Amino acid sequence: MSDLLSRRLALLGAAANLPLLTECLHGIERECLRVDSDGKLALTPHPRALGSTLTHPQITTDYSEALLEFITPTETDVADTLGDLERIHRFASSKLDGEYLWSPSMPCELPDEESIPIARYGSSLIGRLKYVYRKGLALRYGKTMQCIAGIHYNFSLPERLWPLLRQAEGSELSERDYQSAAYIALIRNFRRYSWLLMYLFGASPALDAGFLRGRPSQLERLDEHTLYLPYATSLRMSDLGYQNNAQAGLTPCYNDLQSYIDSLRQAVSTPYPPYEKVGTKQDGEWVQLNTNILQIENEYYSSIRPKRVTYTGERPVQALAARGVQYVEVRCLDINPFLPLGIDLDEARFLDAFLLFCAFSDSPLLNGECSDATDNFLAVVKEGRRPGLQLQRRGQPVELKVWANELLERIADTAALLDRARGGEAHAAALAAQRAKVADAELTPSAQVLKVMRERGESFEAFSLRQSREHAEYFRQHPLAAEEQARFEKMASDSLAEQTELERDQDGDFDTFVAAYQASILGLISN
């Protein structure tokens, strides 16, 4: 164990401080496509019974009208978070009217690009802005790529913990700056070690052959309708032969919060010539919000983000600049198609131990390690189960299994501390389940997906549809209690009323609204 990690764990293990570890906050966002009874993309509008996608706090859409997003409230116990997620699934499933929630991350057989419906949010100015932003994504990256689903895991340490560490370490940073620096250090370590998550939880080794739209790739054929890589863990997180040149040069520095903010500010205010050629309007219709490298900050694709809850009308980078980092959003997790929620308690508890390890361990600046971190991540998503696979650690080759076991040995200390804080051995058990996967790659979700498909002679689509139907049956057999159902019904109707009120009460025109939105980031740069 590193000196810094051991000192911090000793400090937090003291009787007076141990309860702090029960105050970590968790939230989960789960995306999933709606599909029809044949496993094809649902072309129906978002079900009105689920409420307004603009104003509902827990049920919305991501890119497509058919790409649902379920958002839990924050909880201190991740078991409660998963309980929240299950209740959202049960309610949504009861309103789908013959449609299913698609079980894996990689999409079903998709119609042609033109026919994939972009999510709509009504006629309010903010609703129209969200729609035009998505039109811009289609223009820049294509609609097909936007139909990939994932799980986002939001995690924060208690606010009371940071002053304790700051004082113990004699830091001269302000409390806010110390907290932000600690979260950025967590992110640096996450970049170093996130390949491990891809090995343990990657669940997308195969995809529908039509997904690539005829583009060349390194993928092999499993059957007439399925492409795969034999040792892949997460094709979702690979490049899939897909590159966006505009973002290729955008590598936000995680040396400190300010440099991260500066790189995003620059990207959302720097024109990109190919986008300039298109312009923001065609035939008088908006096609993208602007012609910059990024339309908005959230367009930047990354495996983890520093976050701060925003005020109404505030942009993410403004919130970070004004009040610092509040939590992290882990964005690289595949949906496990064997699980009704796409994630379970073992995974969540391991993530907590892993993120605490990243937060409390020494985290020097990445500098030359950046390319190694990227290369390791890509190697594992494409061939993480290849026997003897070598990764790069500080410029030296190391076998994945050797490094994985060393990391799990160190993460065991944070898991043990979490178990001391909460009682029981749930985190140690979650860690043991991951050790078993390192010992036997056949236990990983990615290997299990291929094993079942081969044993049953199923294509990716057939496997995924069968899992989707099984999950639908699970939710049908476990309906919400009447009181819970009524609460969700009210949430849905309240959200519809809120959207109607928003559309009725607004004034101003859309062009002015977009200009003001763009000016908010330009104003931040000039300050």
From Swiss-Prot:
GO annotation, biological process: glutathione biosynthetic process
Gene Ontology cellular component terms for the protein in this record: cytosol
Known pathway: Sulfur metabolism; glutathione biosynthesis; glutathione from L-cysteine and L-glutamate: step 1/2
Organism superkingdom: Bacteria
EC number in record: 6.3.2.2
Keywords, in A-Z order: ATP-binding, Glutathione biosynthesis, Ligase, Nucleotide-binding
Gene3D superfamilies listed in its UniProt record: 3.30.590.20
Catalytic activity: L-cysteine + L-glutamate + ATP = gamma-L-glutamyl-L-cysteine + ADP + phosphate + H(+)
Pfam families membership: Glu_cys_ligase
Transmembrane portions of the chain: none
Keyword Protein biosynthesis: no
Broad enzyme group: ligase
GO molecular function: ATP binding; glutamate-cysteine ligase activity; metal ion binding
Entry's family note: Belongs to the glutamate--cysteine ligase type 1 family. Type 1 subfamily.
Name of the protein in question: Glutamate--cysteine ligase
Organism field: Pseudomonas aeruginosa (strain UCBPP-PA14)
Classification lineage: Bacteria, Pseudomonadati, Pseudomonadota, Gammaproteobacteria, Pseudomonadales
